[in-house]
């Protein structure tokens, strides 16, 4: 279902990175029905080593939990941080060059006017027919009211947000010129950024805290899913988190 034309992305949810690679290989490339698809080269060498690869990590997010974290998440942070540090140690032993990085200092979340405007356009027929009144969740932050609010996004705000989005993409490309991929917790603020810039990412199970899986995210350069997948495969070959499942009884 279309939600936001310039941000919607199709991805796979699989047990292993190898499975993700198979699904991605089937999905990628033009099919003649979507003019936004790019016929970019994709060469995956899953057995290539990681030695010498430049791997960044968002230093702030490896050292403190998100400001938006719940009380439970803040309580669990020390255990999660140990899992993240273990992941860094694993990559360090694999011979990668780890380097701390910081995200571009631009208000990624504040330009979500783009996201909301595109959602309003995608559901324009529903809005005009009054179908949003039948949606569940009538509270102020519910989907129905979110769609109504898209009617009142000023054109000036939308255009300015597009300009900031362009700057954000330029700064992300400059950042990615310094590293092959970068690592972050799965609840990283980078998801707001890459949602706008299109940089590919892969989330892996990095362990468990109080019985709940916690993730490690690998983000790569534009159209370089192959490197993201290769790094993810190396991580899963060195760990067993992805093979753990809850008891069925």
Report the location of each language-model feature:
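Short amphipathic alpha-helical coupling segments at ligand-binding clamshell hinges
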Residues: 19-23, 83, 161, 212, ...
């Amino acid at each position: 279902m279309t939600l936001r034309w310039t941000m919607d992305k199709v991805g796979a949810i699989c047990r292993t990175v190898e499975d993700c690679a198979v699904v991605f290989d089937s999905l990628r490339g033009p099919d003649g029905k979507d003019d936004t698809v790019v016929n970019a080269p994709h060469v995956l060498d899953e057995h290539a080593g990681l030695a010498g690869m430049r791997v960044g990590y968002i230093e702030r997010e490896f050292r403190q939990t998100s400001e938006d974290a719940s009380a439970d998440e803040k309580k669990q942070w020390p255990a999660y941080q140990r899992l993240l540090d273990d992941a860094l140690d694993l990559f360090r032993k694999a011979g990668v060059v780890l380097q701390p990085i910081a995200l571009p200092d631009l208000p990624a979340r504040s330009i979500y006017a783009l996201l909301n405007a595109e959602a309003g356009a995608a559901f324009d027929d529903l809005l005009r027919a009054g179908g949003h009144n039948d949606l569940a969740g009538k509270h102020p932050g519910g989907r129905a009211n979110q769609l109504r609010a898209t009617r009142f996004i000023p054109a000036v705000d939308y255009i300015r947000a597009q300009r900031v989005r362009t700057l954000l993409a330029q700064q992300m490309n400059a950042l990615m010129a310094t590293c092959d991929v970068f690592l972050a917790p799965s609840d990283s603020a980078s998801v707001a950024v890459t949602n706008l810039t299109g940089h590919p990412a892969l989330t892996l199970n990095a362990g468990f805290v109080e019985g709940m899986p916690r993730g490690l995210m690998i983000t790569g350069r534009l159209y370089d899913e192959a490197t993201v997948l290769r790094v993810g495969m190396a991580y899963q070959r060195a760990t067993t988190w992805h093979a753990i499942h809850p008891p069925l009884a």
